[in-house]
Amino acid sequence: MSDILLGSYKTRLKNLRFITFFVLARSYLSAPYNGMQNRAYAFILITLMIDAIGIGLVFPIMPDLMDRVGASSTGEGALWGGVLMASYAGALFIFAPIIGSLSDAYGRKPVLLMALFILAVDYVVMALATEFWVLLIGRIFAGIAGATYTTATAYIADISSPEKRAARFGMVGAAFGIGFVLGPAIGGIAAELHITAPFWIAAVLSAANVLFGLFVLPESLEPRKRRPFWFSDINPFTAIIGAFKTPGLAIPLICLFVFEFANMVYPVLWAFFTRELFDWSSFTIGISLAGYGILLAGVQGGLMPVFINRVGEFRTLQIGILSALIGFIGFGLISTVTGLILVLIFAALSDLSPPMITAMAANKVDEDKQGLVQGVIASLASIAAFLAPLIMTGVFEVFVDEDGIYLPGAPFLISGVLIALLIPLVWRLRSHAQS
């Protein structure tokens, strides 16, 4: 099984190398700005890709990592892993507006480079950790450093003309996508050498990027355009409450939150679930996650435009919701690798739904509120990413306990129930759709 996956992965990796080269080469050659700004743009893309790699490389090695710090069973390891993931998401949620406001006050470059330096140090700490509390502190600092996404995107806005911003933000998505595919693959393959190898690799990448940034990254925010740091600007709940009071926006936001919460079962439990059912190694887990990432990219970039053109937004949303329901129920009941592969197709198709709901939410507000709505959506996703790991891993631990009912897929069934409860709300979104 591993040999087959490795062969398939090598082919995909060649394609990803080409994509990575194309992304970076385009950032150097095609932007209508001077060479320094082009190199700065490339630096931002690399930074975001490293952030995504850092998130993804932890997933496949999580079971082994929990064993290393003293977890006595797969269930206990999953619970501890859930705490780590929740701590990362919590730090990200709290510090994202703080980091963004600091960059508005003191400039983008110092904030970005300091965060990257913290991330490099954090990876070294994670590599050396033999106690759970050290890993916990490390994940919190990783979440703080990972909050630089807002600063990175602000930097791109600073150096891009209005007509080029959309295309460049699209490249941000491409950089994140490449990172999320490479991260699990690097984690799984490097773990074959040693459980700490992925962290050392990530530390070297982050440190090298800091040095790169020192030389090629100019400050993009002129002193005259900066504004003082105000604590009133860093409360994410103010914007969330305001968004829910906007007519027609509450239902799409509820749907997105529930969908994000249910979908978190995949990154949170995939490694523990496949280890428990099939005794997969970190390598196999990492390659499976990378393959799933490629499958998601195919759905988003290939199938989604086809579905929208053929059946419209609302039908595409329905297909995604139905696929999500089938996927969650399937994962809750499967017992074979063949079944897992079949269900994985439906899980990937479920990714049709969030963009449709997001578009419907965006259609409910004026142009000057689009940034606010997207920020609220990101905040709700962060809240889901904080709550879901704690709940899902707790359920998993209960249902893999030898003294109770053995059902490793129970968290997936819970996600399926949530999606089923969401269906009446989704059907009310028809009036928001543009067919």
Predicted regions and their residues:
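Cytoplasmic helix-loop-helix junction between adjacent transmembrane helices
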Residues: 138-177
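Juxtamembrane intracellular "pre-TM" segments in multi-pass secondary transporters
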Residues: 218-255
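C-terminal transmembrane helical hairpin of 12-TM major facilitator-type secondary transporters
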Residues: 314-357
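Short amphipathic helix-loop junctions that connect adjacent transmembrane helices
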Residues: 61-78, 268-285
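Multi-pass alpha-helical transporter architecture, strongest
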Residues: 210-216, 413-435
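A membrane-interface helix-boundary motif in multi-pass transporters
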Residues: 191-204, 394-417
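Conserved MFS/SLC helix-loop-helix module at the cytosolic interface between two early adjacent transmembrane helices
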Residues: 93-130
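Central cavity-lining transmembrane alpha-helices of secondary-active solute carriers
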Residues: 83-99, 290-303
